[in-house]
Amino acid sequence: MPELPEVEVTRRGLAPAIVGRSVTAVNVRTPKLREPLQDLAALLPGLTLEHLERRAKYLIWTFRSAAGEKRWLLTHMGMSGSWRIWSLPAPSAHKHDHADIVFGDVLVRYTDPRRFGSILFMTTDPRKSLPLTKLGCEPWDPTLTADRFYTELQKTHRSIKDCLLYTSDAADD
């Protein structure tokens, strides 16, 4: 499973190649991953990617339309998913390549052999709705002090390991 550090590495790898660029095409080859995929081929083209950030193990893609409206993709790589960058022409898609997002001469491909990942198109900020609102603070959050951590531990009878893995205490879902 891609853990938080791998998701951050993915974000850092994707962002320089695609932030500031407009979506020119989308190809979805699988109608359903963990959840049904919306018609991304109709929803994304023409939108410009403004920002790509990570929250826990989610990638938040912030787009803006020509009219100035914001739209988002909330993606999770599940157990075995990955995002890859290709210069066009890209290699032919294989069995587990489920979605391509084209930004001019750059293609970003989502691959997931186990199909446990998700790609959700949203018209509201995903940081203000589930599942992100139930997550705890990030590991590098300056508000996560030793005193705060100790106070949170006093509220539970779980082991420290369970607290670290429990997503409402630490952002690692």
Whereabouts are the PLM-identified features?
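A cross-family signal for N-terminal binding/gating loops and helix N-caps
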Residues: 1-108
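Phosphate/anion-contacting hairpin/loop surfaces
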Residues: 68-168
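A short, hydrophobic C-terminal helix/tail in secreted or cell-surface proteins
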Residues: 169-173
